[in-house]
Amino acid sequence: MMIPQVFWLVPIASIVALGMAYYFFTQMMKADEGTPRMKEIALYVRKGAMAYLKQQYKVVGIVFAVLCVLFAFMAYGLNVQNPWVPFAFLTGGFFSGLAGFFGMKTATYASARTANAARESLDAGLKIAFRSGAVMGLTVVGLGLLDIAIWFVVLNHFDADGLISITTTMLTFGMGASTQALFARVGGGIYTKAADVGADIVGKVEADIPEDDPRNPATIADNVGDNVGDVAGMGADLYESYCGSVLSTAALGAAAFGVAGLEIQLKAVIAPMLIAAVGVFLSLLGIFLVRTKEGATMKDLLRSLSVGTNVSAILIAAATFCILYLLDIQNWLGLSFSVIAGLAAGVIIGQATEYYTSHSYKPTQKISEAGQTGAATVIIKGIGRGMISTCIPVITIGVAIMLSYLCANGFDLSMSSESLAHGLYGIGIAAVGMLSTLGITLATDAYGPIADNAGGNAEMSSLGEEVRHRTDALDALGNTTAATGKGFAIGSAALTALALLASYIEEIKIAMTRAGVMMENVKGELISAADANIPDFMNFFQVNLMNPKVIVGAFVGAMAAFLFCGMTMEAVGRAAEKMVQEVRRQFREIAGILEGTGTPDYGRCVEISTRAAQHEMVIPSVLAILIPIIVGCVLGVAGVLGLLVGGLAGGFTLAVFMANAGGAWDNAKKNIEEGAFGGKGSFAHKACIVGDTVGDPFKDTSGPSLNILIKLMSMVSIVMAGLTVAFM
């Protein structure tokens, strides 16, 4: 089939994104890295980060090799899968890993340069940190669109089975991205929190030395962890959501407009790709708008970032109307409002996250106040606030789902096959809308760890009080953007997972068609699977709440979220114990560390975190892959759909709770460090340090990893659909 000329905007946008990422990287590298001590600290962090990444990619490489052999056997041996699947799976993982590598490399080079630029002015420091974060954002969208464009062209040339087959096959490269993302998130989260918890317990609580103090042996490992978890991990997470939303929406478009003719169907497939492509150019505009003035307050700094992100979001909303109108897609106006629903949901979730986690607002201030009565009340208050904080994001996502569904199908509640298909396409388009400005939203996320490392570098390099004041301001801004970024990642994961859930039925349809299965439709007529629609499949597999397979699947899905969280929390605990023991040993055995005359063995702490992360990340990650396969073989399609619904509902709510509780504990401690309730060293401060330490794995390991779990279970189910059908 002929590819429309307008499609080539997608690869052009990817090349522009990658070109601008390279430009920002070279501009950052031209900046001065500072004093010899600043360079030395940056080198320690860079070596530690790259050593970890090398080890992680070795482990992931083994897992990918095993899965690739399995997919090849399913495709060429059992003939239950498209023969392109093993190759698509590999490219998804490769590009996700490549994005993480580039982002990590940039961040580790940028921290010292940000600290040094802060010696000149606040604006200079902000620009270097933010544009270095933009390298991550632009690399993710650039590589994502490049992978999508290449596979669309290749499959369009070689796959003669039509657009539904092409788009569902492309979805399988999302499993490669999901698998890589899970290892990056879980491994990175364990690494960073083992170092952070160890540094806090022995350094702050026992030895009473400040954060990022060079006397603390775990300080370098802690700074390495910021890059490992919050740059590479967050990048892989959002790369997966970005590609998953575009590809699942393309697959839903192929299904929804299949009867409208090939031309309309093709337009529905490329529409999400074009929205994402235009989003690249508008994200770039937003990035260049971010700037601030000397002596800026936190509100000024937040406003400077908000200008960039809000301008990009408003313009992409306007551009969507133009794109869908020019494509002449049926109900283009309603679909445009579906995109706006997704964009609005992202903004509201971000604002709600800021309200519940920033110490500028009452929820976190109340946790600080609870510190006056001890650590127990801090923990109780934080858990309570975290649970309450789930209300707004859950309601927002629910409203966004309903609005995007109804706008796309013309407010038709009949649940007919056409109405359902168009509504599901609208939900997918909403997910694309939320992620369309990922170039700038991920830049604000990646900015956080760069600013944090810059503050650490300034502290360890003993820079002046004014410089520390500036880096503290940048770091405080980074904490806020990191919290809102986590909320955005969770919200986008929920919408993407729902779109993937709908795509699963299309993959089942293709698997049954390949197997030559005949089935009864809702009227009781015997038809080919190729001619069946979604209500026919729901009826055939008895997907309803009275089917015990669906209920059992939902229970297993909800349980999987808690099991996964429990395993990752315990993994952090075990790794942190080793770190605490090592830091205590060094304080005890290496003379002069606390006096500042002895040099800690930073490398040993980096090694402990690296080994712990590699060892501990395997079982939770493999479990996430195995659960959908086992449920599919035992409970069939109905059980898998129950699993995905239960996993989505339980995982989304639990992820919001953990991210917000952890963020609130962190900022409650910072609130006291700024002078509230007795300030640093007070009883309330020590109580809030305990809360912060408990919250670390909540917000940076288990919570963020759940985003990937709910998407990975959907991806695995899609890829294994042929096997599930074979076991019917």
Name each model feature, range by range:
Residues 1-728:
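Hydrophobic packing and interface segments
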